[in-house]
Amino acid sequence: MLNNIVNTIHSDKNQKGTFFIETWGCQMNEEDSEKLSGMLKNIGYKNAEDKNQADIIIFNTCCVRENAELKVYGNLGALKGLKSKNPNLIIAVCGCMMQQEGMAEAIIKKYPFVDIIFGTHNSYKFPEYLNRAKQEGKSIIEVWDKEEEIVEGIPVDRKSSTKAFVTIMYGCNNFCTYCIVPYVRGRERSREVSDIEKEIKELVKSGYKEITLLGQNVNSYGKDLEPKVSFAELLRHVNEIEGIERVRFMTSHPKDLTEDVIYAIKECDKLCNHIHLPVQSGSSRILKKMNRYYNREDYLNLVNKIKEEIPNVAITTDIIVGFPGETEEDFNETLELVKEVEYDSAFTFLYSKRKGTPAYDIEEQVPEDVKHDRFKKLVEVVNKSCEKNNKKYQDRIVKVLVEGESKNDKNKLSGRTDTAKLVNFIGNKDNIGKIVDVKITKTLSFSLEGEEV
């Protein structure tokens, strides 16, 4: 592991200026942006609330779906005018999208005003690239094809002062046929337990109450370490860290979620009763084409085991509609599975062709109108399930970690239960950052309302 690498890259802390980071994509991207922000603040820069006033603009991109890429193109085009007015403006583009073959060159060709392009494997070197861009006055492209060892000691500028992401591993070895992630994030690499523990203890000192352990597939954690450490062992270890009050994790691949992990959640008091368990499809035939390594029966057996051991657990999921070759029968199997599991919530997506993935070349693509029709039906079923689960909370007193003011009503506070339910409630603002009791007075499809007691 490389430690305190940032200090060796760029020691000048007298930089003056502002920066703006726009992030698309998953929680891993969000944490990457927090690290970019941390590095910039470490050398003297400050956040700009408006990108029009920034000296540095960074777009941290996602390529999991086409829509995310289109947003990047549109937003990049809008920066041309800003660059014309302010030639000293530094524009950087990074993230998963840049790891795609030929993408960096295509971006520079279409948007020659971009100053810096870098990928997911070397974001820790951004201060160096920034320095070079200022001195050399020409575009810098630094996209590494292969991942290197994990870099520790990068400063992190976290958005929340209450809860934090803690990455425990990077990359993915699963190669689902629809997914670009293994190609742009590299192979699985686990952080040492001691490094994870150190980061969490530092968060506790700073007043954080909740952490979310992050990885593309957290259940594979530790397989590459010597000696090997299981994810369940890590969970039990983290549960013993004094001061942290809640521990979450995501994302779990169903094929790797062991009984030991289920027992750890059941037995460890700080582990939240919430599991995000992406099913992607309810059809065994489609799951095989997706290369998911489990079938419908396997998944349902796992869900039943989870519910048997953790009675009050909340289960959420991801579902893809319109995977190539999906028939009406396949889709109906997905609907029936959603009804049977009764998810607390679900992220639903239209299948998006990703160049470089095996599914891209499958000829039997589902027509767009059929995909949209199925998507609408799925959302209706999911929403009914969410509403049904939320109604169980009516008149109950639940513990809520107060995260801040409600986005929709400044007179209310907002937070989440250990089952990840969003609660907007009337309460004391002095309790922001604390866990309080809230009586639920109203249930909605996607949130709860209540009063602090």
From Swiss-Prot:
Residues 17-135 form the MTTase N-terminal domain. Residues 158-388 form the Radical SAM core domain. Binds 2 [4Fe-4S] clusters. One cluster is coordinated with 3 cysteines and an exchangeable S-adenosyl-L-methionine. Residues 391-453 form the TRAM domain. [4Fe-4S] cluster 1 binds at C26, C62, C96. It is an enzyme of class 2 (transferase). It catalyses: N(6)-dimethylallyladenosine(37) in tRNA + (sulfur carrier)-SH + AH2 + 2 S-adenosyl-L-methionine = 2-methylsulfanyl-N(6)-dimethylallyladenosine(37) in tRNA + (sulfur carrier)-H + 5'-deoxyadenosine + L-methionine + A + S-adenosyl-L-homocysteine + 2 H(+). It holds the Pfam family Radical_SAM. GO terms for cellular component: cytosol. InterPro entries: Elp3/MiaA/NifB-like_rSAM, Methylthiotransferase, Methylthiotransferase_CS, Methylthiotransferase_N, Methylthiotransferase_N_sf, MiaB_methiolase, rSAM, rSAM_horseshoe. It comes from the Bacteria. It is found in: Cytoplasm. Its main location: cytoplasm. [4Fe-4S] cluster 2 binds at C172, C176, C179. Gene3D superfamilies: Methylthiotransferase, N-terminal domain, tm_1862 like domain. Its cofactor is [4Fe-4S] cluster. NCBIfam families: miaB-methiolase, MiaB/RimO family radical SAM methylthiotransferase. Belongs to the methylthiotransferase family. MiaB subfamily. Catalyzes the methylthiolation of N6-(dimethylallyl)adenosine (i(6)A), leading to the formation of 2-methylthio-N6-(dimethylallyl)adenosine (ms(2)i(6)A) at position 37 in tRNAs that read codons beginning with uridine. This is tRNA-2-methylthio-N(6)-dimethylallyladenosine synthase. It comes from Clostridium tetani (strain Massachusetts / E88).
